[in-house]
Structure formats: C-alpha cells, structure tokens
C-alpha cells in the first residue's frame, strides 16, 4: 500500500513551505489525554485566529500578530525565507495579554468543557431575524460585532464576544458532543450545530439565541456541516456514509449524496458555491457537483484504491479534514498517514505535501495564503499554500457560478466544451 499512485514519483511532489507553529503551555496542561486541537478557525474579516488547545481552553490571537511572528506578510509575501518562527509556549499562557496601542486584544478562554467545534460569526445589522419580528431583543449586534461559538463535549454551545472575551449566551439542547458549528455567511447570525446525538439544530442569535429548527435525517452521529456561500444550502456529514443537503429557506432535505464507503467527517463548499468537498475515513476526498448529485473528482490517499470493504474499516488512511482555498482552485486535506496534502482541482495527484504527525483538522486563512492544521498534542502548524495566478477563464467561471446553478449553465446557448468547463466537468 502506498500514499501515491504508481504513476507519481513522490520525490517530484513539492514540499509545502512550513512557516511556523503555535505551541501550548507545558504546565499545568502537560497530560497527554485531553490535549487535542480538535478545531481551528479564522475570523471572516481575517482579524483573528482561534484554536482549541485542549483542556477546555480556546486561544484567540490577532492574525496579524501570528503573521508578524511567522515568515509571511498579510498577502502571503515571504519576509524570512530561511527559518520559520514560533510563538513560544510562554506567549500562549493564560490570561488576557495587554496589546499595543490600537492592536486588537488577545484572549485565553476557559470554556468549561472540551471544545470540539468552533466558528466565528459576524453581524450585518440590516439582516433581520429569520424566525421572529419583534422590536426588542436583549442583544443588539452591531456591524462591528464579532462572535465566537464553541461546542462542548457536554452538549452545550457557548457564544463569546471576541473583542472582550466575555460569555454572551449559553445554548443548551443537545444531549451529546457538539462536533461542529457553522454560521451562515450572510451576516444573519444563524448558527447550525452538528452533534453526535444525530441532530442538527438551527439557532438564531439575533433572536437572543432561540432555537429555530431541528433537522432530522441522519441515521447516526453528525460530524460536520457547512453553509453554501449564499447561505441557501447546508451540507451535513456523519457516520454511516451520510452526506445530506438541506434547503435552509424551508429547512427541508434536498437530497442525499452517495459515494463514500465509511464515515464522512468533514465538508466544505467552494467559494463560488458550485463544488462541495467531503472527507471520509474511506481514504478519499470527493469533490461533488452537489446541484446534480454527481461526483466530479476523487482524491485518493491510499493506492492501489482499496475495496469498499477495506475502505469501510480501519485502513490507516482516514482523512480527518478538508478545506477549500479562497481561490477556488486548491483543496487541503489532513489524513492519518502523517501528511497534509495540497491539491489542485485540475489534477489527480497532490501539488504539494507536508509532514504532520497526528493531524486532526485544517483551515485556510481568509485570503487563502496560509493553511493552519491542529494536532493531537494541541499545537497548530502553518504552511504557505501553493499559489499561482488564476487564469481569466477560471475567474470568469467563478463569477458566473456564484449566480448560476449547474442546471442554468447547462441551459445556456454555448458550445459543449465551454459548458463542460463552466460546470467543472473537465477537472
């Protein structure tokens, strides 16, 4: 068994540039159990980076500080090409750090339980509550409001003010681990929680955190969920090979996607909303045309490709996480073979790889220039994403697919090769 197909020479694959890491304090949190960094997240405006460093602790750090400590600038330009840098263990110890004048503050938050899921949410004041229209609310979220939602192992969800580190809301309805959280990207502060109690719950934070809907349909544990860029569709994935698509205007099930052979643990839409990537314990990342329910691309992590029976068991190549880059052309995945892979949607083999023992999760920065990945020891590692100038054709395709569905593109009076390109059938 190999990590790459026979046609690919591993030595020919580029090594991703490692730029730095965040380390957790050694004491008092030096026990091996409970140190896992189950989740990492970037604020939508790129102002903050957050990660669960184990033992109930979430660390909030201004992303500009991380970049200044590493070897890239805000735009991804290399400033120190020879040596990556690290934020020391001392700099990650508890308490609030007093920032320089004008700099955003850092916070260390004790969430009261092991943090499995985490998400940033920002408000758009003109977006009204979807569930109720009343004049008075306890919380009035302004344009500059930035929230952090944390999902705990006891089923609770806690909402924090990022700028002050204070607890705003405590949401209680799940009966098991909250594995993932995701905010609608339209600024409505609609929050979806995915739990191992087999349920998805929809919360309206503009209505003081009231629960709007429970989405039933998963036969087993729910591991992750993701909104489409226009907030109209939700994808949820879980145990028993489940990949479900939901209409978030009507809160109804659209369809189930079939193709995985094991638990599906991570999902994310492309920036234009045309593609959906799902990661599974069956050693694969599948890229879907979710509007047609068809598979466009399979990114394998074990070769020769395993049989469905072997893929459905303990195959030592479980894919833990997948993330789409902001350029719409690159995908990153973390798997149990101690590698992070950077993929191009135009190729079947990784464009670059990096070593990462015991990786658990990954996320691209808002600009897509940096990938962050959390590990079992609570640390977070950072790499530069392979970058290249996107073609004008790809930029035009992304612009079109933000407003046109696959079915609408297929109805356009254009040549078949162009139609295939616009619907990503040539990836």
UniProtKB/Swiss-Prot annotation:
It comes from the Eukaryota. GO terms for biological process: intracellular signal transduction; protein polyubiquitination. WD repeats lie at residues 129-170, 173-213, 217-256, 259-298, 314-353. Keywords: Repeat, Ubl conjugation pathway, WD repeat. Disulfide bonds: none annotated. SMART domains: SOCS, SOCS_box, WD40. Pathway: Protein modification; protein ubiquitination. Residues 379-427 form the SOCS box domain. Probable substrate-recognition component of a SCF-like ECS (Elongin-Cullin-SOCS-box protein) E3 ubiquitin-protein ligase complex which mediates the ubiquitination and subsequent proteasomal degradation of target proteins. Component of a probable ECS E3 ubiquitin-protein ligase complex that contains the Elongin BC complex. The SOCS box domain mediates the interaction with the Elongin BC complex, an adapter module in different E3 ubiquitin ligase complexes. This is WD repeat and SOCS box-containing protein 1. It comes from Takifugu rubripes. The gene is wsb1.
């Amino acid at each position: 068994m190999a990590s790459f197909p026979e046609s690919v020479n591993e030595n020919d694959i580029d090594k991703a540039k490692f730029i730095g890491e965040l380390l957790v304090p050694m004491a008092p949190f030096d026990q091996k159990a409970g140190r896992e960094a189950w989740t990492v997240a970037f604020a939508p405006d790129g102002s903050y980076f957050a990660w669960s460093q184990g033992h109930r602790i979430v660390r909030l750090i201004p992303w500009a500080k991380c970049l200044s400590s590493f070897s890239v600038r805000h735009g991804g330009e290399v400033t120190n090409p020879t040596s990556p840098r690290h934020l020391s263990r001392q700099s990650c110890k508890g308490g609030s750090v007093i920032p320089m004048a004008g700099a955003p503050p850092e916070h260390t938050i004790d969430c009261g339980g092991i943090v499995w899921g985490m998400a940033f949410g920002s408000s758009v004041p003109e977006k009204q509550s979807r569930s109720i229209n009343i004049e008075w609310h306890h919380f009035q979220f302004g344009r500059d409001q930035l929230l952090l939602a944390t999902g705990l192992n006891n089923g609770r969800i806690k909402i924090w003010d990022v700028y002050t580190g204070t607890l705003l809301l405590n949401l209680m309805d799940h009966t098991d681990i909250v594995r993932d959280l995701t905010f609608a990207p339209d600024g409505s502060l609609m929050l979806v929680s995915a739990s191992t109690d087999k349920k998805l719950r929809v919360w309206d934070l503009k209505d003081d955190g009231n629960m709007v809907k429970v989405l039933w349909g998963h036969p087993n544990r729910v591991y992750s969920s993701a909104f489409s860029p226009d907030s109209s569709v939700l994808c949820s994935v879980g145990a028993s090979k489940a990949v479900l698509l939901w209409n978030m205007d009507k809160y109804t099930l659209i369809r189930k996607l079939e193709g995985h052979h094991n638990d599906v643990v991570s999902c994310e839409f492309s920036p234009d909303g045309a593609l959906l990537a799902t990661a599974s314990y069956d050693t694969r990342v599948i890229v879907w045309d979710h509007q047609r329910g068809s598979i466009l691309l399979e990114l394998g992590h074990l070769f020769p490709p395993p049989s469905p029976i072997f893929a459905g068991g303990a195959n030592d190549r479980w894919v833990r996480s997948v993330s789409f880059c902001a350029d719409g052309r690159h995908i990153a995945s973390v798997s149990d073979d101690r590698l992070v892979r950077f993929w191009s949607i135009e190729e079947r083999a990784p464009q670059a790889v990096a070593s990462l023992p015991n990786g658990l999760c990954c996320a691209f920065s808002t600009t897509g220039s940096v990938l962050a990945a959390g590990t079992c020891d609570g640390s977070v590692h950072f790499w530069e994403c392979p970058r290249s100038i996107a073609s004008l054709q790809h930029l035009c395709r992304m612009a079109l697919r933000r407003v046109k569905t696959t079915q609408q593109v297929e109805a356009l009076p254009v040549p078949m090769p162009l139609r295939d390109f616009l619907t990503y059938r040539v990836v």
